[in-house]
C-alpha cells in the first residue's frame, strides 16, 4: 500500500466514537489485496481497522495524516517494494 518507515503521532488518535485507537492484537503472515503477503498486521482494540496512507515516506510530527477506513486493517510497509512489517 504505502511505503512508510516511521510513524510518530504526538497526540492520541481517536476513533469515530472518541475512544483512543489501540493496537490490541497482532495477526501474523496473512494475505492482503492482490495476494501480497503481510507478515504483520495490527488490529484496533474494538476490531475496527484502518489503512494508514500518506504521500510521505516518513510521517513525523507536523505532517498531515489522512486515515481511510478500508476492510478492517491497516498495513505499514518497510520499503518501496511493499515488504510489509
From Swiss-Prot:
GO terms for biological process: defense response to fungus; killing of cells of another organism. The N-terminus is blocked. One of its GO terms (molecular function) is antioxidant activity. The keyword Isomerase does not apply. The keyword Plastid does not apply. InterPro entries: Kunitz_inhibitor_STI-like_sf (IPR011065). Keywords: Antimicrobial, Antioxidant, Fungicide, Protease inhibitor, Serine protease inhibitor. Stable for 7 days at room temperature and for 30 days at 4 degrees Celsius. Remains active after incubation at 100 degrees Celsius for 3 hours. Belongs to the protease inhibitor I3 (leguminous Kunitz-type inhibitor) family. Inhibition of trypsin. Has anticarcinogenic activity, prevents transformation of DMBA-treated JB6 cells. Has antipromoter activity, prevents promotion by tetradecanoyl phorbal acetate (TPA) in JB6 cells. Prevents tertiary butyl hydroperoxide-induced mutagenesis. Protects AT base pairs and shows antimutagenesis activity in TA102 and TA104 S.typhimurium mutagenesis tests. Inhibits paw edema formation induced by phospholipase A2 in Swiss Wistar mice. Prevents the release of arachidonate, the parent compound for the synthesis of prostaglandins and prostacyclins. This is Turmerin. The lineage of its organism: Eukaryota, Viridiplantae, Streptophyta, Embryophyta, Tracheophyta.
Amino acid at each position: 500500500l504505502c511505503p512508510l518507515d516511521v510513524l510518530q503521532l504526538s497526540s492520541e488518535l481517536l476513533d469515530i466514537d472518541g475512544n483512543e485507537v489501540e493496537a490490541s492484537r497482532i495477526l501474523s503472515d496473512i494475505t492482503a489485496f492482490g495476494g501480497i503477503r503481510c507478515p504483520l498486521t495490527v488490529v484496533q482494540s474494538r476490531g475496527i481497522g484502518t489503512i494508514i496512507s500518506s504521500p510521505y515516506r516518513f510521517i513525523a510530527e507536523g505532517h498531515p495524516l489522512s486515515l481511510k477506513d478500508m476492510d478492517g486493517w491497516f498495513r505499514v510497509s518497510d520499503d518501496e517494494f511493499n515488504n510489509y512489517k
